[in-house]
Amino acid sequence: MLTFLIPTAKEMTTPKESHPHLLPQDSQAILKIMTAMTTEDLAKSYRIKEEAAKKEQQRWQDMASQQSLAYPAYQLFNGLMYRHIKRDKLTTQEQAYLTQQVYITSSFYGIIPANHPIAEHRHDFHTRIKIEGQSLKSYWRPCYNQFAKEHPQVISLLSSEFDDVFSKDCKQLWISPKFMAEKEGQFKTHSTISKKARGAFLTACMENNCQTVDSLKSLVFAGFYYHPDLSTDHEFVYIKKEA
C-alpha cells in the first residue's frame, strides 16, 4: 500500500463540520511556548505585522483555554495544492483512500491523518522557537522517523522545508514526484505549477485507487504524464506540454 505525505498550508477556510479540539501530548510543549509569546514576539517569529499577530495570539489563547473548535485538516487547509485536491462528493473508495493513505506533516501536530481534527493556527518549521532547547525539526525528528519506519513506501509531496526533518536513512524507498512544464523543448518548474500539480496528482491517485509504484507511471492528470527518460527510481517526473 502506498502512503502519501503532504504539507500543511497557511491559507485556511472554516468548514461546516467541527469537533472538540483534542491536542496530542507532543504538541502541548509547543502550545505552552506559543501562548507565552507577546504579539511582538509572534510578529517577529512569523515575520508578519503586529495586527496580524494579534489574530494568531488569540488563536493560541483559545487553544490553551480549550475554546477552539477543530476541523478535518484536509478541509481546513485551503492553499493552492489543497484547492486542487478532490475534497467533496467523494466515493466511498476515494474517502477511504484519502483518510487511510494520506497524511499531513505538521510542525505543531506532528504527522496526522488527512481527516484529523485540528484547530485554526499558523505554524510551520520556519517558526523561530526552541522546545526544550531544540529546534522544531530536532524536536519532531524521532516522531517523524518512527512514522517513516512504519511506512517504508512513501510518496512524498512535501516541500523542501521537510527534507531534513526526516533522517536520510528513513527515506530509502521514498518517491518524490516532480512536475514540469515543457515549451519548445525547454522544461521548467515553479511553485505554482508544483502546488497545483500535487493536488491534481493526489486526486488522480485517489480516483484510480493507485496501490503500487508502477500504477503511478500510467497516470494522466491535468495534462501531465509520466516521463520515463527524466525519471529515476526516487524521482518520478511528470510533464505537461504548454502551447
UniProtKB/Swiss-Prot annotation:
Tell me where the signal peptide lies.
none
Coiled-coil residues are: none
**Name of this chain's protein:** UPF0246 protein spyM18_2163
Give the protein family: Belongs to the UPF0246 family.
Q: Which GO terms describe its biological process?
A: response to hydroperoxide
Q: Which InterPro entries match?
A: YaaA
- Per the record, GO CC terms? cytosol
Q: Which Pfam families match?
A: H2O2_YaaD
